[in-house]
Protein backbone atom coordinates (compact mmCIF):
# COMPACT_ATOMS: atom_id res chain seq x y z
CA UNK A 1 0.00 0.00 0.00
CA UNK A 2 1.20 3.50 -0.84
CA UNK A 3 1.81 5.58 2.30
CA UNK A 4 1.34 8.82 0.34
CA UNK A 5 -2.17 10.17 0.97
CA UNK A 6 -3.83 11.38 -2.22
CA UNK A 7 -5.53 14.77 -1.92
CA UNK A 8 -9.33 14.81 -2.47
CA UNK A 9 -9.24 15.64 -6.19
CA UNK A 10 -6.76 12.84 -6.96
CA UNK A 11 -8.68 10.55 -4.61
CA UNK A 12 -11.93 11.21 -6.46
CA UNK A 13 -10.33 10.34 -9.79
CA UNK A 14 -8.70 7.21 -8.38
CA UNK A 15 -11.86 5.97 -6.67
CA UNK A 16 -14.02 6.65 -9.75
CA UNK A 17 -11.68 4.57 -11.91
CA UNK A 18 -11.73 1.62 -9.47
CA UNK A 19 -15.42 1.57 -8.48
CA UNK A 20 -17.77 -1.38 -8.81
CA UNK A 21 -21.09 -0.10 -7.45
CA UNK A 22 -21.04 3.61 -8.35
CA UNK A 23 -20.44 5.15 -11.77
CA UNK A 24 -20.78 8.49 -13.54
CA UNK A 25 -23.19 9.25 -16.38
CA UNK A 26 -21.77 11.66 -18.96
CA UNK A 27 -25.25 12.72 -20.10
CA UNK A 28 -26.15 13.56 -16.51
CA UNK A 29 -22.93 15.56 -16.11
CA UNK A 30 -23.77 17.53 -19.25
CA UNK A 31 -27.32 18.27 -18.05
CA UNK A 32 -26.14 19.25 -14.58
CA UNK A 33 -23.45 21.55 -15.95
CA UNK A 34 -26.09 23.36 -18.02
CA UNK A 35 -28.32 23.85 -14.96
CA UNK A 36 -25.43 25.10 -12.82
CA UNK A 37 -24.10 27.40 -15.53
CA UNK A 38 -27.50 29.05 -16.06
CA UNK A 39 -27.71 29.75 -12.34
CA UNK A 40 -24.20 31.24 -12.20
CA UNK A 41 -24.70 33.22 -15.39
CA UNK A 42 -27.87 34.86 -14.11
CA UNK A 43 -26.13 35.77 -10.84
CA UNK A 44 -28.73 33.64 -9.06
CA UNK A 45 -25.87 31.86 -7.34
CA UNK A 46 -22.48 33.04 -6.07
CA UNK A 47 -20.44 33.05 -2.86
CA UNK A 48 -22.73 35.86 -1.67
CA UNK A 49 -25.55 33.30 -1.45
CA UNK A 50 -23.93 31.95 1.73
CA UNK A 51 -24.85 35.06 3.69
CA UNK A 52 -28.41 35.06 2.35
CA UNK A 53 -29.24 32.27 4.79
CA UNK A 54 -30.82 33.86 7.86
CA UNK A 55 -28.76 31.90 10.40
CA UNK A 56 -25.34 32.57 8.89
CA UNK A 57 -23.39 35.54 10.30
CA UNK A 58 -23.27 38.72 8.24
CA UNK A 59 -20.45 40.60 9.98
CA UNK A 60 -16.95 40.17 8.54
CA UNK A 61 -14.99 40.07 11.81
CA UNK A 62 -12.67 37.86 13.85
CA UNK A 63 -15.68 36.86 15.96
CA UNK A 64 -17.27 35.47 12.79
CA UNK A 65 -14.13 33.43 12.03
CA UNK A 66 -14.46 31.87 15.50
CA UNK A 67 -18.17 31.18 14.84
CA UNK A 68 -17.37 29.41 11.55
CA UNK A 69 -14.66 27.31 13.19
CA UNK A 70 -17.07 25.98 15.83
CA UNK A 71 -19.70 25.42 13.14
CA UNK A 72 -17.43 23.20 11.07
CA UNK A 73 -15.92 21.42 14.05
CA UNK A 74 -19.48 20.19 14.69
CA UNK A 75 -20.73 20.03 11.10
CA UNK A 76 -21.50 16.32 10.74
CA UNK A 77 -24.06 13.53 11.13
CA UNK A 78 -27.44 15.18 11.71
CA UNK A 79 -29.63 12.36 10.44
CA UNK A 80 -31.67 10.36 12.95
CA UNK A 81 -32.73 6.73 12.95
CA UNK A 82 -35.99 5.77 11.25
CA UNK A 83 -39.04 6.33 13.41
CA UNK A 84 -37.48 9.09 15.51
CA UNK A 85 -38.54 12.71 15.44
CA UNK A 86 -35.84 15.00 14.01
CA UNK A 87 -33.48 16.79 16.39
CA UNK A 88 -34.99 20.30 16.44
CA UNK A 89 -33.77 23.67 17.73
CA UNK A 90 -36.25 26.49 18.30
CA UNK A 91 -34.76 29.93 17.77
CA UNK A 92 -36.67 33.21 17.67
CA UNK A 93 -39.96 31.38 17.28
CA UNK A 94 -38.86 29.15 14.40
CA UNK A 95 -37.92 25.47 14.39
CA UNK A 96 -34.82 24.23 12.58
CA UNK A 97 -33.49 20.73 11.86
CA UNK A 98 -30.18 19.26 10.73
CA UNK A 99 -27.40 21.65 9.78
CA UNK A 100 -29.67 24.64 10.34
CA UNK A 101 -30.39 23.44 13.88
CA UNK A 102 -26.62 23.52 14.50
CA UNK A 103 -26.46 27.15 13.30
CA UNK A 104 -29.52 28.07 15.36
CA UNK A 105 -28.08 26.35 18.44
CA UNK A 106 -24.80 28.25 18.19
CA UNK A 107 -26.64 31.56 17.78
CA UNK A 108 -28.99 30.80 20.68
CA UNK A 109 -26.07 29.92 22.96
CA UNK A 110 -24.29 33.19 22.18
CA UNK A 111 -27.50 35.14 22.84
CA UNK A 112 -27.78 33.34 26.20
CA UNK A 113 -24.31 34.56 27.17
CA UNK A 114 -22.48 31.26 26.61
CA UNK A 115 -19.02 31.84 25.10
CA UNK A 116 -19.41 28.88 22.75
CA UNK A 117 -17.14 30.27 20.04
CA UNK A 118 -14.19 30.92 22.37
CA UNK A 119 -11.54 28.15 22.48
CA UNK A 120 -10.88 29.14 26.11
CA UNK A 121 -14.44 28.02 26.85
CA UNK A 122 -14.88 24.97 24.69
CA UNK A 123 -11.48 23.41 25.46
CA UNK A 124 -13.14 22.28 28.72
CA UNK A 125 -16.67 21.64 27.44
CA UNK A 126 -18.62 18.63 28.75
CA UNK A 127 -21.34 16.45 27.26
CA UNK A 128 -23.80 17.98 29.74
CA UNK A 129 -22.85 21.45 28.50
CA UNK A 130 -23.59 20.39 24.93
CA UNK A 131 -26.86 18.71 25.94
CA UNK A 132 -28.00 22.06 27.34
CA UNK A 133 -26.65 24.19 24.49
CA UNK A 134 -28.20 22.01 21.77
CA UNK A 135 -31.35 21.03 23.70
CA UNK A 136 -34.10 19.86 21.39
CA UNK A 137 -37.79 20.69 21.06
CA UNK A 138 -38.34 16.97 20.46
CA UNK A 139 -37.32 13.90 22.46
CA UNK A 140 -34.42 13.32 20.03
CA UNK A 141 -31.02 14.60 21.14
CA UNK A 142 -28.33 15.91 18.83
CA UNK A 143 -26.49 12.82 17.50
CA UNK A 144 -22.93 11.97 18.63
CA UNK A 145 -22.80 14.39 21.57
CA UNK A 146 -19.80 12.64 23.13
CA UNK A 147 -17.81 12.86 19.89
CA UNK A 148 -18.77 16.52 19.44
CA UNK A 149 -17.55 17.39 22.93
CA UNK A 150 -14.29 15.55 22.22
CA UNK A 151 -13.82 17.49 18.95
CA UNK A 152 -14.33 20.81 20.70
CA UNK A 153 -11.93 19.96 23.52
CA UNK A 154 -9.26 18.81 21.06
CA UNK A 155 -9.48 21.84 18.79
CA UNK A 156 -9.96 24.28 21.67
CA UNK A 157 -6.81 23.11 23.42
CA UNK A 158 -4.70 23.31 20.27
CA UNK A 159 -6.02 26.76 19.30
CA UNK A 160 -5.46 28.06 22.84
CA UNK A 161 -1.96 26.61 23.18
CA UNK A 162 -0.58 27.07 19.66
CA UNK A 163 -2.64 29.58 17.67
CA UNK A 164 -3.33 32.54 19.96
CA UNK A 165 -6.78 31.25 20.88
CA UNK A 166 -8.32 31.67 17.42
CA UNK A 167 -8.57 30.05 14.00
CA UNK A 168 -8.03 33.59 12.68
CA UNK A 169 -4.34 33.25 13.61
CA UNK A 170 -4.07 30.06 11.53
CA UNK A 171 -5.58 31.92 8.58
CA UNK A 172 -2.97 34.67 8.90
CA UNK A 173 -0.16 32.10 9.08
CA UNK A 174 -1.46 30.47 5.87
CA UNK A 175 -0.84 33.77 4.05
CA UNK A 176 -3.95 33.64 1.82
CA UNK A 177 -3.29 30.07 0.64
CA UNK A 178 -6.24 27.66 0.79
CA UNK A 179 -3.82 24.82 0.02
CA UNK A 180 -1.54 25.67 2.95
CA UNK A 181 -4.45 26.29 5.32
CA UNK A 182 -5.96 22.90 4.44
CA UNK A 183 -2.63 21.25 5.24
CA UNK A 184 -2.40 23.12 8.55
CA UNK A 185 -5.93 22.10 9.57
CA UNK A 186 -5.53 18.40 8.82
CA UNK A 187 -2.06 18.22 10.36
CA UNK A 188 -3.03 19.97 13.60
CA UNK A 189 -6.49 18.55 14.26
CA UNK A 190 -7.12 14.79 14.23
CA UNK A 191 -10.88 15.32 14.06
CA UNK A 192 -10.53 16.97 10.63
CA UNK A 193 -8.32 14.21 9.16
CA UNK A 194 -10.88 12.54 6.94
CA UNK A 195 -8.95 9.87 5.04
CA UNK A 196 -8.84 6.11 4.54
CA UNK A 197 -7.67 3.17 2.44
CA UNK A 198 -9.21 2.26 -0.92
CA UNK A 199 -7.82 -0.46 -3.21
CA UNK A 200 -4.43 -0.38 -1.45
CA UNK A 201 -4.16 3.39 -1.81
CA UNK A 202 -4.46 6.01 0.92
CA UNK A 203 -7.17 8.47 -0.13
CA UNK A 204 -8.71 11.56 1.44
CA UNK A 205 -11.95 13.53 1.36
CA UNK A 206 -11.36 16.28 3.98
CA UNK A 207 -15.01 17.33 3.93
CA UNK A 208 -15.03 19.45 7.09
CA UNK A 209 -11.52 20.86 6.63
CA UNK A 210 -12.38 22.05 3.14
CA UNK A 211 -15.78 23.45 4.04
CA UNK A 212 -14.19 25.33 6.95
CA UNK A 213 -12.03 27.22 4.46
CA UNK A 214 -14.88 27.58 1.96
CA UNK A 215 -17.34 28.95 4.53
CA UNK A 216 -14.74 31.52 5.59
CA UNK A 217 -14.13 32.49 1.95
CA UNK A 218 -17.85 32.81 1.23
CA UNK A 219 -18.74 34.72 4.39
CA UNK A 220 -15.90 37.20 3.85
CA UNK A 221 -16.68 37.40 0.11
CA UNK A 222 -13.11 36.55 -0.83
CA UNK A 223 -11.68 39.45 1.20
CA UNK A 224 -9.84 39.86 4.51
CA UNK A 225 -9.84 36.58 6.42
CA UNK A 226 -11.55 35.04 3.37
CA UNK A 227 -9.02 36.05 0.72
CA UNK A 228 -7.82 32.87 -1.00
CA UNK A 229 -6.71 33.38 -4.63
CA UNK A 230 -6.34 29.59 -4.87
CA UNK A 231 -9.86 28.79 -3.63
CA UNK A 232 -10.27 26.57 -6.70
CA UNK A 233 -7.77 24.18 -5.07
CA UNK A 234 -10.67 22.88 -2.97
CA UNK A 235 -13.07 20.18 -4.18
CA UNK A 236 -16.70 19.55 -3.31
CA UNK A 237 -17.44 18.40 0.24
CA UNK A 238 -18.29 14.70 0.16
CA UNK A 239 -21.17 14.25 2.59
CA UNK A 240 -24.44 12.29 2.54
CA UNK A 241 -26.66 15.03 1.05
CA UNK A 242 -24.91 16.14 -2.19
CA UNK A 243 -24.53 12.54 -3.52
CA UNK A 244 -28.31 12.21 -3.24
CA UNK A 245 -28.71 15.36 -5.35
CA UNK A 246 -26.20 14.09 -7.90
CA UNK A 247 -28.17 10.84 -8.17
CA UNK A 248 -31.42 12.76 -8.69
CA UNK A 249 -29.75 14.81 -11.44
CA UNK A 250 -28.72 11.60 -13.21
CA UNK A 251 -25.01 12.25 -12.60
CA UNK A 252 -24.35 9.30 -10.27
CA UNK A 253 -25.50 5.77 -11.05
CA UNK A 254 -25.75 3.05 -8.40
CA UNK A 255 -25.74 -0.74 -8.72
CA UNK A 256 -28.92 -2.61 -7.79
CA UNK A 257 -27.19 -3.98 -4.68
CA UNK A 258 -26.29 -0.48 -3.48
CA UNK A 259 -29.76 0.89 -4.28
CA UNK A 260 -31.27 -1.91 -2.19
CA UNK A 261 -29.08 -0.96 0.77
CA UNK A 262 -30.12 2.69 0.49
CA UNK A 263 -33.84 1.99 0.05
CA UNK A 264 -33.90 -0.35 3.05
CA UNK A 265 -31.92 2.10 5.18
CA UNK A 266 -29.02 -0.24 5.91
CA UNK A 267 -26.13 1.33 7.79
CA UNK A 268 -22.94 1.52 5.70
CA UNK A 269 -19.89 1.55 8.01
CA UNK A 270 -17.42 4.41 7.77
CA UNK A 271 -14.47 3.28 5.63
CA UNK A 272 -16.54 0.67 3.77
CA UNK A 273 -15.81 0.43 0.04
CA UNK A 274 -19.41 1.40 -0.82
CA UNK A 275 -19.19 4.55 1.29
CA UNK A 276 -15.89 5.51 -0.31
CA UNK A 277 -17.27 4.87 -3.80
CA UNK A 278 -20.21 7.20 -3.13
CA UNK A 279 -17.97 9.94 -1.75
CA UNK A 280 -15.13 9.59 -4.26
CA UNK A 281 -17.42 9.50 -7.28
CA UNK A 282 -19.24 12.57 -5.95
CA UNK A 283 -15.95 14.48 -5.83
CA UNK A 284 -15.05 13.42 -9.35
CA UNK A 285 -18.55 14.13 -10.67
CA UNK A 286 -18.41 17.71 -9.39
CA UNK A 287 -14.93 18.11 -10.90
CA UNK A 288 -16.33 17.06 -14.29
CA UNK A 289 -19.30 19.41 -13.89
CA UNK A 290 -16.87 22.19 -12.94
CA UNK A 291 -14.73 21.61 -16.04
CA UNK A 292 -17.82 21.62 -18.28
CA UNK A 293 -19.14 24.82 -16.68
CA UNK A 294 -15.70 26.43 -17.00
CA UNK A 295 -15.68 25.72 -20.75
CA UNK A 296 -19.11 27.32 -21.10
CA UNK A 297 -17.96 30.35 -19.06
CA UNK A 298 -14.93 30.96 -21.27
CA UNK A 299 -17.26 31.27 -24.27
CA UNK A 300 -19.75 33.48 -22.46
CA UNK A 301 -19.57 37.31 -22.56
CA UNK A 302 -20.31 37.45 -18.82
CA UNK A 303 -17.06 35.65 -17.99
CA UNK A 304 -14.84 35.72 -21.08
CA UNK A 305 -12.99 38.91 -20.09
CA UNK A 306 -11.96 37.54 -16.69
CA UNK A 307 -8.45 36.18 -16.14
CA UNK A 308 -8.11 32.75 -14.52
CA UNK A 309 -7.66 34.13 -10.98
CA UNK A 310 -10.76 36.32 -11.24
CA UNK A 311 -12.81 33.52 -12.78
CA UNK A 312 -11.79 31.19 -9.94
CA UNK A 313 -13.53 33.49 -7.45
CA UNK A 314 -16.83 33.21 -9.34
CA UNK A 315 -16.62 29.65 -10.55
CA UNK A 316 -15.15 26.71 -8.64
CA UNK A 317 -16.09 23.37 -7.11
CA UNK A 318 -17.03 25.12 -3.85
CA UNK A 319 -19.76 27.19 -5.51
CA UNK A 320 -21.03 24.12 -7.35
CA UNK A 321 -21.15 22.18 -4.06
CA UNK A 322 -23.08 25.01 -2.37
CA UNK A 323 -25.55 24.96 -5.28
CA UNK A 324 -25.94 21.17 -5.19
CA UNK A 325 -26.39 21.11 -1.39
CA UNK A 326 -29.20 23.65 -1.59
CA UNK A 327 -30.69 21.73 -4.54
CA UNK A 328 -30.56 18.50 -2.52
CA UNK A 329 -32.26 20.12 0.48
CA UNK A 330 -34.98 21.57 -1.75
CA UNK A 331 -35.82 18.19 -3.33
CA UNK A 332 -35.32 16.22 -0.09
CA UNK A 333 -38.98 15.33 0.37
CA UNK A 334 -39.32 13.97 -3.17
CA UNK A 335 -35.82 12.56 -3.65
CA UNK A 336 -35.81 9.38 -5.72
CA UNK A 337 -33.48 7.56 -3.32
CA UNK A 338 -32.58 8.02 0.37
CA UNK A 339 -29.21 9.34 1.51
CA UNK A 340 -26.62 6.75 2.47
CA UNK A 341 -26.46 6.23 6.23
CA UNK A 342 -22.97 6.29 7.72
CA UNK A 343 -22.49 7.41 11.31
CA UNK A 344 -19.21 9.33 11.48
CA UNK A 345 -17.67 12.58 12.72
CA UNK A 346 -16.33 13.40 9.26
CA UNK A 347 -19.61 14.40 7.56
Swiss-Prot record:
EC number: 3.2.2.-
Coiled coil: none
Catalytic site positions: 239
One Pfam family per UniProt: Q_salvage
Positions that bind queuine: 53, 237, 239, 321, 326
InterPro entries hit by this protein: Q_salvage (IPR019438)
Cysteine pairs bridged by disulfides in the record: none
Entry GO MF terms: hydrolase activity
Reaction(s) catalysed by this chain's protein: queuosine 5'-phosphate + H2O = queuine + D-ribose 5-phosphate
GO BP terms: tRNA-guanine transglycosylation
PANTHER family linked: QUEUOSINE 5'-PHOSPHATE N-GLYCOSYLASE_HYDROLASE, QUEUOSINE 5'-PHOSPHATE N-GLYCOSYLASE_HYDROLASE-RELATED
Family: Belongs to the QNG1 protein family.
Function: Catalyzes the hydrolysis of queuosine 5'-phosphate, releasing the nucleobase queuine (q). Is required for salvage of queuine from exogenous queuosine (Q) that is imported and then converted to queuosine 5'-phosphate intracellularly.
Other remarks on this protein: Eukaryotes lack the canonical genes for de novo biosynthesis of queuosine (Q), present in most bacteria. Therefore, this molecule must be sourced from ingested food and/or the gut microbiota, and metabolized to its corresponding nucleobase, queuine (q), before incorporation into cytoplasmic and mitochondrial tRNAs. Incorporation of q into the anticodon of some tRNAs contributes to translational efficiency and accuracy.
Protein name: Queuosine 5'-phosphate N-glycosylase/hydrolase
Upper taxonomic lineage: Eukaryota, Metazoa, Cnidaria, Anthozoa, Hexacorallia
Amino acid sequence: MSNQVMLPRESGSFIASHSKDVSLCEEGISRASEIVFKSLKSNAYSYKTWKDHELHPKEMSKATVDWIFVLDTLNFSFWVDDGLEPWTIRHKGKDFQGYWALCAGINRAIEEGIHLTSPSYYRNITIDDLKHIFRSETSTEMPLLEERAKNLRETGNILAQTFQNSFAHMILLANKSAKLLLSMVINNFDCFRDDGDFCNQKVSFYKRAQILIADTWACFEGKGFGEFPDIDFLTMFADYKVPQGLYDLGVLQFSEALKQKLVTGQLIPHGDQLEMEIRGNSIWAVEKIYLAVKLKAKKSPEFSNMDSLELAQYLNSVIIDFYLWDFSKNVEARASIPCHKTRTIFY
